[in-house]
Amino acid sequence: VGALSVLLDMEYEIFEELISEQFASKKNLIEPNLKALNIGRDYVLNNLPYPIGLTLERMEKNDGKILISGNEAAGLGAVYGGATICAWYPITPSTSLAEGFEKYAKKFRVDEKTGKNLYASVQAEDELSAIGMAIGANWNGARSFTATSGPGISLMSEFLGLAYFAEVPVVVFDVQRGGPSTGMPTKTQQSDILACAYASHGDTKHVMLLPEDPKECFEFSAMAFDLADRLQTPVFVVTDLDMGMNDWVVDELEWDDSRKFDRGKVLDFEALEKMEEKFGRYHDVDGDGICSVSYTHLTLPTSRSV
């Protein structure tokens, strides 16, 4: 440590302070550690060229910063985005995203009067069941999602094609890992881009959001549910193991409490009554490629912020 303090041109006084703090309860260890620190420092000063071109400066830039992983941020973003259903199957490195959603749903998705859960987190028997549950919940009016990794995307592809052509919104989090097939669950890679963009056979082209840090994981997670409802299609939030499982230092997460959910072209009873022609689920009245949908028999999630 003493040698590195010189090679990296670090403030020597910092190490003296840290040693004194570390061994404050064991005063007899302070002097030997300071002596060892000085031995390393003096050796470099007398025998090696220094500094080596790299410099570590005192970091005093933590104001307004938090420490959070991409998966936890995305799970929180799903709660703020109005998600009430998470259907998932355990797979590294996405499992902690589903667990993060459940953690925050227990705080924000419980009825204060009755104590009843206003959410469901379902660990399915496999990836096919997970995506099927997520699509079914969205078809029934809920905001639902699943979280998986590359092997799961392969297994979910046919269901994703169904959601695409039936125009059913669903959000899929793909926390990428390394290699084809089972691959390397504990290694990071960004190799699912095309697999997500064109998931399923046939003419499918999916919406993808690619955050660059956990702060954007939170923001893009909430955004994904609005996009899925507005466009009536699957939306992918694609991250990787490094971002998903590791804690990053990022700016504090921000949320506009006046923000409302965008449920897209949803017709209620009043809107249906005013229609001059018969409602058609796949009738493109506006000519923008997005048809109206009726959830009149359902209870929609509230539009107020959590």
Segments the model singles out, each with a brief description of its role:
Residues T296-T302:
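Conserved small/polar residues in nucleotide/adenosyl-binding loops
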Residues S292-S294:
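Acidic, proline/serine/threonine- and glycine-rich low-complexity intrinsically disordered segments
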Residues M10, L34-N46, H206-D262:
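Structural signature of the thiamine diphosphate
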Residues I14-A199, K205-H206, P211:
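Thiamine diphosphate
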Residues V1-E21:
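Short alpha-helices
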Residues L7-D9, K27, T95-S96, G179-S181, ...:
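Short, well-ordered, mixed-charge alpha-helical segments that flank or form enzyme active sites
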Residues M245, V249, D256-R263, D268-G289:
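Active-site loops and adjacent core secondary-structure elements that bind or stabilize anionic groups
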